[in-house]
């Protein structure tokens, strides 16, 4: 079949790869100048297969209210003037029950663990370099009350068989030697040995080249203006400069999936949750992180690439704007300087923001729509990198009419239409 993929971030390019592997004739279009230019550009770099957790959880509403009054809040809410922002928040609050949390957690772990397996197969097949490190994630807690609050998440790790180890402050330095200098600031730690790290943008750029070798065609600077259909099937996708026909269409447009597909009267429950990152050069390897350190107090991740440190996190609900407030930069700089003061050069750091496509239940939208030939692979929130290959393989199998290797029927848009 001729398959048109909308979006050239990690979700779209990964989908193109598996569709081409399945023998389809694949075309990818994107409004940007190249691949991985938006949400995939400078994310935190974590491949967090083990600590895949819904935002919507019991106790989150209370926590969110407290965070709003912190000097460096991990969550920030700014009214964007739309009724939809309120509707989305209400849907998220409805998912903050124990029952919904367990259902959503199971779905997310299922996709993430499958994605881990897809990464294993992919690396064996291609040997691609994307500065991957398989040295786990270290979550640090600065206060005892944070440890107590995390007990529910730790119980879920136990239930799903995700390997972990509780650590005393001094034991954290076994995995991150540079933290030996600051153990007095740590109450305890949690190590997830099966997690990994990697540069999402580098991965997507290299995968783009592999896709081209398989015959996938890419068209950039293509802003979608119209989608023509007959009520049952998509006929053409029109941009400002071209017209694309296909037997099947895959939407992997992240936050913009909702706005682009609104013309089809499809109501995708996706809201743009803004995140920030700093990227700085390593100046002292002994003083830098080895893998990823997740600071529970600030909800900030510090990740090591080969010669760079990526500091990313926070969540801001403020619509589609991507301004770079100095206050957010200060938060990221504070955390990395507090834990790894000798690791990198903040004066040379680049500051970035991106929009995460979040659903109210934190689970992506994967699979069919009411249009026979329109499929979704979007809405991954903060886990688009982690879930990328697993979601893409599921999407390619569904488009191809194959049975998926894991359950996928509860991942489609229909769960919001029941």
Swiss-Prot record:
Q: Which HAMAP family match?
A: DadA
Q: Does the keyword Oxidoreductase apply?
A: yes
Protein name per its UniProtKB record: D-amino acid dehydrogenase
Signal peptide residue numbers: none
What pathway does this protein act in?
Answer: Amino-acid degradation; D-alanine degradation; NH(3) and pyruvate from D-alanine: step 1/1
Q: Which organism encodes this protein?
A: Neisseria meningitidis serogroup C (strain 053442)
- A Pfam match is DAO
EC class of the enzyme, as a word: oxidoreductase
Q: Taxonomy-wise, where does this protein's organism fall, top ranks first?
A: Bacteria, Pseudomonadati, Pseudomonadota, Betaproteobacteria, Neisseriales
UniProt record, GO biological process: D-alanine catabolic process
What's any one GO cellular component for it? cytoplasm
Q: Which residues form a coiled coil?
A: none
Quote the gene name from the UniProt entry: dadA
Listed A to Z, the keywords are: FAD, Flavoprotein, Oxidoreductase
């Amino acid at each position: 079949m001729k398959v048109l993929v909308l979006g050239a971030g990690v979700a779209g390019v990964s989908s193109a790869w598996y569709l081409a592997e399945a023998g389809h004739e694949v075309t990818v279009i994107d409004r940007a100048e190249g691949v991985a230019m938006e949400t995939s550009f400078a994310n935190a770099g974590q491949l967090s297969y083990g600590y895949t957790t819904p935002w919507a959880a019991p106790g989150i509403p209370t926590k969110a209210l407290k965070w709003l009054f912190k000097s460096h809040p991990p969550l920030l809410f700014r009214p964007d003037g739309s009724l939809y922002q309120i509707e989305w928040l209400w849907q998220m609050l409805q998912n903050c029950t124990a029952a919904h949390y367990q259902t959503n957690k199971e779905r997310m772990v299922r996709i993430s663990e499958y994605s881990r397996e897809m990464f294993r197969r992919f690396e064996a097949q291609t040997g691609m370099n994307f500065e991957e490190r398989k040295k786990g994630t270290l979550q640090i807690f600065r206060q005892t009350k944070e440890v107590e609050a995390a007990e529910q998440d730790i119980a879920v790790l136990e239930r799903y068989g995700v390997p972990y180890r509780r650590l005393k402050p001094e034991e954290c330095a076994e995995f991150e030697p540079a933290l030996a200098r600051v153990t007095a600031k740590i109450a305890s730690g949690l190590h997830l040995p099966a997690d990994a790290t990697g540069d999402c943008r580098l991965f997507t750029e290299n995968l783009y080249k592999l896709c081209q070798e398989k015959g996938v065609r890419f068209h950039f600077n293509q802003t979608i203006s119209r989608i023509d259909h007959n009520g049952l099937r998509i006929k053409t996708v029109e941009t400002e400069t071209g017209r694309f026909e296909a037997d099947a269409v895959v939407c992997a447009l992240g936050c913009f999936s909702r706005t682009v597909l609104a013309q089809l009267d499809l109501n995708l429950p996706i809201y743009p949750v803004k995140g920030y990152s700093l990227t700085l050069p390593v100046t002292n390897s002994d003083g830098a992180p080895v893998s990823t350190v997740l600071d529970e107090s600030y909800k900030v991740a510090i990740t090591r690439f080969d010669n760079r440190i990526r500091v990313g996190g926070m969540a801001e609900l403020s619509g589609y704007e991507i301004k770079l407030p100095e206050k957010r930069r200060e938060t990221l700089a504070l955390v990395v300087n507090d834990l790894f003061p000798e690791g990198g050069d903040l004066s040379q750091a680049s500051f970035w923001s991106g929009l995460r496509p979040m659903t109210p239940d934190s689970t992506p939208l994967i699979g069919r729509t009411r249009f026979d030939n329109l499929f979704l692979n979007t809405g991954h929130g903060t886990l688009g990198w982690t879930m990328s290959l697993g979601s893409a393989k599921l999407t390619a199998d569904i488009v191809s009419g194959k049975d998926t290797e894991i359950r996928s029927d509860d991942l489609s848009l229909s769960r919001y239409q029941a």
